């Protein structure tokens, strides 16, 4: 017997958040997933600074020949220890921090990671290794603020011979420039082989949206030494030609041997001109009345979700979150109806792989964890980034600093109407009326943050529906990465302005989805449709073609690693050994929304840093040594990265009735177009995936929602509207509702 109403009862209890604690993991336990507090960060930093053998100096010291702490973040405990703590009431694991230290003040500089604990009063330290037997190279480290300051002054000094050249061709300079200064954007990887630190810099005019204002000059600088005096400019590229050094370009310019391009003045004086094309200032006609405000989300009685520390309760859902400084947004212990659906769903990496005609354009392969993907989570604007009704949450990062840095309103949490019913039906009587109408309002809960990695803005969402569906979504916006226009560049992009080329690129995002569908013992299977041709049983002289189900069970990791170009089945199921009352394995379906393709050939030079990008989906057995598919260091040493996802698959482990992890790659090709000026817009530039219950419940769990409306026709008078709303209407006044349901000729 299938007691469907039992699920609805459980979820209804969970919707009454005041009683949720009786069936939830206690909120204080969720702190096992929480980011470090400012006090904990300070305690770790103080502990490290006081260890004389480390010889630490402040990060902001203007030298690279120093030892300094680059990153402090929470070190996630082992899963088995956390589950024993959450599910069995065992002692909680030690709370620890991960600390990344740059050791530059020694003969052989290196980067070393440490675990520091226990918090809040640390007294021990132990070395960590991203990959057994692999030592982090000095050249693989991310660039620090101190290094950027040194780079700016080095470029400023090195280009002094070009001062007049800059003034004549751009109207801007590096010297005495006030509001007409030049700046630069650096690209990566930094060289062509492991151990190098040779960066190309795009020289730009520092105006609003300077990413769209290249000057035509790009500079290659070797900055691999800890001694700035050893840094040197190796090459320059200007308007299609290479030069050995600034002096050569200046000399040839002085005698008229350089094919120069004089740029128009973006800041004219005393003239009425439209706003700069890279500006957000409105221009043109838009026929929506400006004296009428747009729609707003309102919740007059307050939120229907509950936030307890880092744990969120909403309808049948509960989950904990953190904002990992190095890689970004993560959610843990995802439960619906009191049962675990996933242990972790997290952003692992975001890359943008470019093509171009200029050296910087062709070199650019951005691997954004190497640029602080999780730490560039700046303030969200009410009414724009999130509804005004959202709960805004702060973040604290220690990334390239000397203490915790407060990022106000770095995340937001809100419920919103979707504008489409979760489900509805009009039951016609086919006589001009109806038997009944029923509908359930569509609402979702959204947890959101953003990452602004220089020019690009990524909007990261985790979305929760009342029918047990969860969605992960990324929207891409911000400025395109652009280079100087040359006719040859049209093979690699689109001309966006007189001297501007928007370069072709592919965005790829990698997620880790640790599925725990009603427990840690899961299996992976797919369902596909096959056509069968058979004799029609009720008309033997005719044939019948119809779809049939074909189920495939996967037993090894290699079988469940789907490469791009290979057909990926539409129904990807993670199943519990438990069966529902109809005899089907209780499952969750992974549904991927993506237009990604393979960009780099397998094994090609820098591709080793992003081998996860070979697979839209790979399913592996859980291993503690396989917690992350990328690292801080893959960007600047992609030729010998410390984390190589392909190695996760080499042991080809059994994946039947095991603790399974789905690694999901989503993305899209972006060929810039004129409408990307000033910014790429979000419509059409979002990708992600859904986790959908598939025979997990005996019926739709959203039946527990009291947002349902049913209308019954009446022979006389008004139709009867059946609603389930709180008895106490003092705090909730429903808007007027009427429904006729008839249809007739006119």
UniProtKB/Swiss-Prot annotation:
Its EC number is 1.4.3.22. Its cofactor is Cu(2+); Ca(2+); L-topaquinone. The active site is at residues 368, 456. Disulfide bonds join 177-181, 386-412. GO terms for biological process: putrescine metabolic process. SUPFAM superfamilies: Amine oxidase catalytic domain, Amine oxidase N-terminal region. Pfam families: Cu_amine_oxid, Cu_amine_oxidN2, Cu_amine_oxidN3. Gene3D superfamilies: 3.10.450.40, Copper amine oxidase, catalytic domain. Coiled coil: none annotated. The modification 2',4',5'-topaquinone is found at residue 456. Ca(2+) 2 binds at residues 557, 648, 651, 653. One of its GO terms (cellular component) is plasma membrane. Catalyzes the oxidative deamination of primary amines to the corresponding aldehydes with the concomitant production of hydrogen peroxide and ammonia. Its preferred substrates in vitro are the diamines histamine and 1-methylhistamine and it could therefore play a role in allergic and immune responses. Has a broad specificity for diamines and can also act on cadaverine and putrescine, two products of amino acid catabolism. It could also act on polyamines, like spermidine and spermine though less efficiently, and regulate various biological processes. This is Diamine oxidase [copper-containing]. It comes from Rattus norvegicus (Rat).
